[in-house]
């Protein structure tokens, strides 16, 4: 709550429309969030006090963590997650989490519509416009697309202004086109690499902050030798 109060002072406002717990992705994050004194209590206090209107959580690593967060029962207003045509074939938030949110009336916020990288677009597997339109055609409340240039902004605006949802057949055709290179996660490295972990979450789990450190490399090597996933 202290962090929320600091944000309100800096923003010079008395409330936030949406307050989300950032970067849920480690296997025991749900249990830590729901324990006594955990972040769920802070979300409850924030809503009850009127300091926030809506609360949710984000994450890009593991759909099972998202699903567990929801199944434990707190009435989240929003859940933010990566949704794109490559996700459908690898650790899929679309397949695992999206139906659960729809069932519970929780607003899905789709992020990383282009997979977080431009590799697939550069290789000609799909176009940027196709990927954005695919993500917007899913049953989401909003699609969040990163913009790093005026050209990208104009491209996104064109897709939005001319938007018509893809048919089920069109969406399946794009999934099928992406599947041969999607199944190993090469275009969704945020699900695999420590480089994309939230630093605060890494510290909470006592991981070194530098993903290139010797300690991390040793842990990854040990994981490869035992066949156990890391993290």
Predicted regions and their residues:
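Glycine/proline-rich, positively charged
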Residues: 1-92, 96, 102-109
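Structured C-terminal cap/extension of enzyme domains
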Residues: 72, 96-231
